[in-house]
């Protein structure tokens, strides 16, 4: 049987995600971001709610990406997620993309030319952002023209690199409906960005997600719920460079801006440059918020939920893969658990995110 992996955030789950799951083949394993997502933001609703949405729409197994995989640049995010999915026994990786290319061919190219492509990337001028450098590399080696604002395609190219040299079939699925960053409310398939933007519009959410009731019932948070704590950490930390990926320049820019701004968006605008993208700045601010430092990734894989098929699959691999189904006295990943504790502070009705939680099973009360 085909075992398909899907890397996702489902922030929140919408009809485009439902379509992606419907097109994936065989048993479907989702490696999903936890309570903080790749672009350096808190998820709108918590990881347990999002796992339930996935399971109700065709996923067979949902596992959590550790914090230092979830909140990373595209290449590290992709590599960490693919590594976890490979340990879970996938043979296919399905992903949405705005542009359909022969990604399998690109993966073979990278496996053969990785050293030269990496050297080319390193030689590009520093005034270019990493996404710009990556686009230039693929244009030079594979003839791919600049893709503009195509975040799913750019992430797909990171999956190409992460899958190079592995026995993994790539299944690109054409993205339908609104663009990734579109905030439009008049699209047939609205984006997660639009749902987050218009979350107060109940009718819009109800027409945009098959799980609208779950989304609307759950505690919802944004960056602004955490700004006072972020500001406190910035103002009271003696050395911001002790936190993950905070260099001297970023520390200086953040410290200089923090006293004169009133929101996270204003802080990001003040700190970002051509070299430091807004996404990178948001990730750095997330690291400061949760006091993240460099740490090894956990050996165990945290299971958020499963169907009957998913449970049967877990039984076939549990002897060779350390699976965590309940976090108790022994921690799974201390950094991810600290991030969960911070996340809980964002809303007075936010349920416990770690201790005593057990995997979700469709149709069963958690």
From Swiss-Prot:
Intrachain disulfide bonds: none
Cross-referenced InterPro entries: Rossmann-like_a/b/a_fold, tRNA(Met)_cyd_acetate_ligase
Any one Gene Ontology cellular component term annotated for this protein: cytoplasm
Subcellular location: Cytoplasm
Primary location class: cytoplasm
GO molecular function, one term: ligase activity, forming carbon-nitrogen bonds
Matches recorded under Gene3D superfamilies: HUPs (3.40.50.620)
Keyword tRNA-binding applies: yes
GO biological process per UniProt: tRNA modification
Binding, ATP: 7-20, 96, 152, 175
Principal EC category: ligase
Catalytic activity: cytidine(34) in elongator tRNA(Met) + acetate + ATP = N(4)-acetylcytidine(34) in elongator tRNA(Met) + AMP + diphosphate
Superkingdom of source: Bacteria
EC number(s) on file: 6.3.4.-
Keywords per UniProt: ATP-binding, Cytoplasm, Ligase, Nucleotide-binding, RNA-binding, tRNA processing, tRNA-binding
Keyword Nucleotide-binding on entry: yes
General function of this protein: Catalyzes the formation of N(4)-acetylcytidine (ac(4)C) at the wobble position of elongator tRNA(Met), using acetate and ATP as substrates. First activates an acetate ion to form acetyladenylate (Ac-AMP) and then transfers the acetyl group to tRNA to form ac(4)C34.
HAMAP family: TmcAL (MF_01539)
Similarity comment: Belongs to the TmcAL family.
Official protein name in the record: tRNA(Met) cytidine acetate ligase
Organism name: Streptococcus equi subsp. zooepidemicus (strain H70)
Recorded name of the encoding gene: tmcAL
């Amino acid at each position: 049987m085909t075992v398909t992996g899907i890397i996702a955030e489902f922030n929140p789950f919408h009809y485009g995600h439902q379509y992606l799951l419907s097109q994936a083949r065989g048993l479907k394993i989702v490696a999903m971001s936890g309570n903080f997502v790749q672009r350096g933001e808190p998820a709108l609703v918590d990881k347990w709610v999002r796992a339930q949405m996935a399971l109700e729409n065709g996923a067979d197994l949902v596992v959590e990406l550790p914090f230092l995989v979830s909140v990373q640049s595209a290449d590290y995010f992709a590599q960490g997620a693919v590594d976890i999915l490979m340990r879970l026994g996938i043979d296919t990786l399905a992903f949405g993309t705005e542009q359909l290319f022969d990604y399998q061919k690109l993966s073979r190219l990278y496996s053969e030319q990785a050293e030269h492509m990496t050297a080319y990337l390193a030689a590009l001028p520093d005034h270019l952002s990493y996404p710009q450098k990556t686009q230039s590399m693929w244009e030079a080696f594979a003839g791919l023209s600049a893709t503009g604002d195509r975040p799913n395609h750019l992430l797909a190219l990171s999956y190409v690199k992460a899958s190079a040299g592995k026995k993994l079939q790539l299944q690109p699925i054409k993205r339908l409906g609104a663009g990734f960053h579109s905030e439009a409310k008049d699209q047939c398939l609205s984006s997660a960005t639009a749902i987050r933007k218009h979350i107060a519009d109940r009718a819009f959410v109800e027409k945009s997600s098959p799980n609208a009731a779950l989304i609307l019932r759950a505690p919802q948070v944004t960056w602004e719920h955490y700004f006072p704590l972020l500001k406190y950490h910035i103002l009271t930390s003696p050395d911001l460079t002790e936190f993950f990926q905070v260099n001297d320049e970023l520390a200086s820019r953040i410290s200089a801006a923090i006293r004169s701004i009133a929101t996270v968006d204003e802080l990001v605008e003040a700190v970002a440059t051509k070299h430091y993208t807004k996404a990178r700045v948001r990730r750095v601010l997330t690291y400061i918020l949760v006091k993240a430092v460099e740490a090894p990734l956990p050996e165990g894989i945290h299971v958020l939920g499963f169907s009957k098929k998913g449970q049967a699959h877990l039984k076939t691999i549990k002897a060779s893969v350390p699976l965590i189904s309940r976090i108790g006295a022994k921690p799974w990943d201390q950094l991810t658990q600290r991030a969960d504790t911070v996340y809980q502070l964002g809303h007075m009705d936010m349920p416990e995110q770690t201790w005593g939680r057990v995997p979700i099973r469709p149709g069963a009360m958690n």
